[in-house]
């Protein structure tokens, strides 16, 4: 098996790091159950010592996607490495946000490093390798089995200074990541959500239990006093201006039309919109 694995590692252009390797992430050495080795595609560097994990549901609302992308973009723009699991939904949005800022991002897989899951994230996988790293502790060719993901989550929590949970139900695997972060002495952050949405039950519960409420990246930077620029929040970019074309449309709306537009931040049944207006 060892000879076969070595051959696959060389063929796949993978770096194999053991606990005693100088490039093995120092943060993982501080947790009680570090992986004995990591398969790496891309690069892990000293900058990654200032890292935040952004995790959440695989089926987010537009609110969750926008928040995950926006906060990750701002953090990455401040020199923070964004760590997530490359799953659909919040994970993918977090990676995209970091990439949009030309920042660093690391994806931790619950499969072999050569197994792209979901398969439609192939382009994202390649972009992450170019702007950071994809890592896994599972042998090459390992399928993305359900039991692999809780094990994967401890690496996500171990690599970072804090974990931000964006949209998660009460049974979400993201809460496992948050729980591990607490066990490892990391900070836990949560994005508040709609109290009527089951996708926010987990995040709102975390806030009740003491997780730090986050509205933007500055909340995280100030709490941890970290920034690649040396000044917490110095790398933050202002929110993009509303396009002139949209301003003209908004200016021509009646008060009733404005009220309806304000309710369309996520998919709604027509009966619900009528009831609320």
Language-model-derived ranges and their functions:
Residues 1-5:
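Helix-hairpin-helix
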